[in-house]
């Protein structure tokens, strides 16, 4: 089951900033040839970025590693932006055959994380019709 970061924000680029460090840490685990997250980036067409992330991390440059995570990669693998964009992302996962998502809400506090999950729940809730 895919684990998907979710950040609700009017600005998708700003939302992406909240998860860059998280993604960089996973891409930097272990060696290039054996890291599934590095391989995911390579397979998605972001091999040079994945290598830069690992190089920066190996040099202790964690801020640079996070900055090297491309928005385009995050936009394909996370739910970022305002509620309508989050809903469209969830629909894209469903259209690809995903039936269950494990969401990882990124927010500064528990209320923000709960609000992000509420946005996701509203996106998948069946629409009620009035008789």
What is each stretch, according to the model?
Residues 1-131:
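Active-site-adjacent structural elements that line small-molecule/cofactor binding pockets in enzymes
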